[in-house]
Structure formats: structure tokens, C-alpha cells
Amino acid sequence: MKYLYFVLLFIACNRALAQTEAVGLFDYHGDIGHPKNAGSAQYDKVTHTYYLKGSGYNIWFNRDEFQFAYKKIKGDFTATAVFEFIGEKGNDHRKIGWMIRESTDDKSIELNTVEHGDGLTVMQWRSLTGENMKDPEGEIFYPEKKFEVIQLQRSGKKLIMRIGHVGGPLKTVGAHEMPNMPDEALLGLFICSHDPEIVEEARVWDVHIEQPAEK
């Protein structure tokens, strides 16, 4: 019995360590909201590509479940990357993109810039901890679908989403003021399967996070 206890403790410690290891530009990664199936994040140093695996019921209502590769960031920034699901088949509501959130609490204040499995492009947010995300007043849809490049920019309390195709100009999806988002927050890449029984995969590359020089 004691042997089994130490084996389980060893497995738990290894999993916890894996969840906090740096991945490329990001200091941490892990599952938010305790999804049924564990996700992962890896970085290929040769191709500068991130590989994300994630499950989770959704990023919606008053709590979230997803895999998150993230770092702490303070002040203004511009984050840009190219996103692609691995595998053509999957839930039309599976999600990848950029996210900024107050904390790793599953009910945290957050804003995400999303590309869905069916190509739907949207900016959505939770303004207060534990608040239900609202449709349609808590999101901005773009009329066109299927873009690869997603950009999230913060200027003061304003967050701006832009999208585009590789090599093309960026188009603005919308902007939203987040007065309750702290100056120091968590920024990163995410994936959610929109199905607790499934683990989805995505690759992300050409990842850049730029911040203005300190005055």
C-alpha cells in the first residue's frame, strides 16, 4: 500500500513539473479548469513551432477548460502568430488562438481571440471573475471565415484583435475595453477541443510578442 502511494505521488509530481516547464517564449504551460483529458505543449527549436494538445468542455459560461502555454506580461504588447489545427476532422467549435487572463483560475477574467474548427473568427471575453460570458454582447464576430494569422494587441485597457492570411494585410475584428484586467496578466496560446472526451491538436508558428521600449 505504501509503495502504491509513493508511485502515485511520483506520477503526480512529474505531471506537475511538466506543467510548469518553459516552452519556447512561454514560461509555463498547463491545463486550466481540470479537463477530463490532459493536454500538453511542446516547442520545436529547429522549426520554431509550438505543438499544442488540449481537451476541455469549452471556454464559455462562467468557467473554462483548455490547455494554455503562457507567460506573465505587464503593460502594452502586440502578440502575433500563425495557427493551424492538425487534422481536418474535428468539432466545428474547437478553438485555438491567443488569450490574456488575470490568473489560472478557471473562472478568471479573460479575453481570447479565437479561430474555430469551422473557421469562425471571434473575439470574446469575461469581464468579471465567475461571470457568464454573454452572447452576443460579450463577443465580436468577423463576417469572413478561415484565417491563419491572429494578432492580439493591448494598449492601456483596450484589447484589439486582428486577423489575416500569411503574407497579407491584417484586418481588424474589433476592440474592447477591459477595465478589470490587471496591468500584469497572463498571455499565451491556447487550444480547447469543445468536447471533454476528445484531445485536439494544433501547430503554431511565427510567434512574436513585442512590447514598447521602457521610457
What is each stretch, according to the model?
Residues 1-20:
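Bacterial Sec-dependent N-terminal signal peptides
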Residues 19-215:
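Extracellular glycan-recognition regions
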